[in-house]
């Protein structure tokens, strides 16, 4: 489904500010795998997501989706393969447009169809059906401006827009971090439901170690541009935060007393 072969990325190469963001990353995700990704600031998590999505082109290495070479395919051409939800609820939506217009824009972009000024009754009914799954009452507010929605509502809409056409890969970039606990719990539940419903291959970056343990069936720990720990299945299910800290300590040779020290 998704393969990264010897992917490396360096920023400001040859200058005093040189930063090796990714170092020889080799990964393979199978169809339907749900992978959580943890690591401190500067570990390479966001760069990894940007390389997969096409925002960045790696200096070295290759990216494959469904066995197709996409390393040099720009972001807008990967939209048919990839859905993405960002940390900022406003990043995945157009706040000055209505819910209906946002959904229509996402549908047209991913389906490679021209965006029409009018929306047919059939498509409105389809949008309402999808919005019903959120249980937020948004199906009755199609003409509401997205900028007037709460952060949780906007993020739920972003999640829906990223997944309702069943992309090959779903990228979640700390998509609950900016929400209050109640809304974060809601988006987490919706994420689990939609990933399971569509059997989506998912990569989710989080700074919450417990969330990384609770969600998904595989976990990556990143540090200094490398995946230093990869665990899945029953071994992941048995992991605790203390166990993760111990794994980080073994690989870094540094002792940490809390997850904040690792993720900060």
What are these model-predicted stretches?
Residues 1, 10-24, 74:
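A short, flexible loop at the N-terminus of ABC-type nucleotide-binding domains that lies
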Residues 38-40:
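The feature captures the beta-strand-to-loop junction immediately N-terminal to the Walker
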Residues 61-69, 229-231:
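Conserved ABC transporter NBD signature motif
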Residues 69-83, 91, 113-116, 120, ...:
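ABC ATPase NBD coupling module
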Residues 162-163:
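ABC ATPase C-loop
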Residues 206-207:
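H-loop/switch region of ABC-family ATPase nucleotide-binding domains
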Residues 226-252:
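Conserved beta-strand-loop-alpha-helix hinge in the C-terminal portion
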């Amino acid at each position: 489904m998704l393969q990264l072969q010897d992917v490396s990325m360096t920023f400001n190469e040859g200058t005093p500010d040189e930063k090796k963001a990714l170092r020889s990353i080799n990964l393979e995700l199978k169809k339907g795998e749900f992978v959580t990704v943890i690591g401190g600031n500067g570990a390479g998590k966001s760069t990894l997501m940007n390389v997969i999505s096409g925002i960045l082109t790696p200096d070295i290495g290759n990216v494959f989706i469904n066995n197709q070479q996409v390393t040099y395919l720009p972001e807008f051409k990967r939209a048919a393969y990839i859905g993405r939800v960002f940390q900022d609820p406003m990043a995945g939506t157009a706040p000055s447009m209505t819910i209906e217009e946002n959904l229509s824009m996402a549908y047209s972009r991913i389906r490679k169809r021209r965006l029409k000024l009018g929306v047919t009754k059939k498509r409105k009914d389809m949008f309402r059906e999808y919005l019903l799954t959120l249980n937020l009452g948004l199906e009755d507010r199609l003409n509401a401006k997205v900028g007037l929605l709460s952060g949780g509502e906007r993020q739920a809409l972003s999640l829906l827009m990223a997944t309702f056409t069943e992309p090959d890969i779903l990228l979640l970039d700390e998509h609950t971090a900016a929400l209050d606990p109640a809304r974060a719990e809601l988006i987490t539940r919706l994420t689990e439901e939609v990933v399971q419903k569509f059997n989506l291959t998912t990569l989710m970056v989080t700074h919450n170690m417990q969330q990384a343990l609770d969600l998904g069936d595989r976990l990556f720990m990143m540090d200094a541009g490398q995946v230093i720990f990869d665990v899945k299945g029953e071994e992941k299910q048995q992991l605790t935060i203390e166990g993760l800290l111990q794994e980080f300590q073994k690989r870094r040779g540094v002792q940490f007393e809390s997850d904040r020290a690792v993720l900060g």
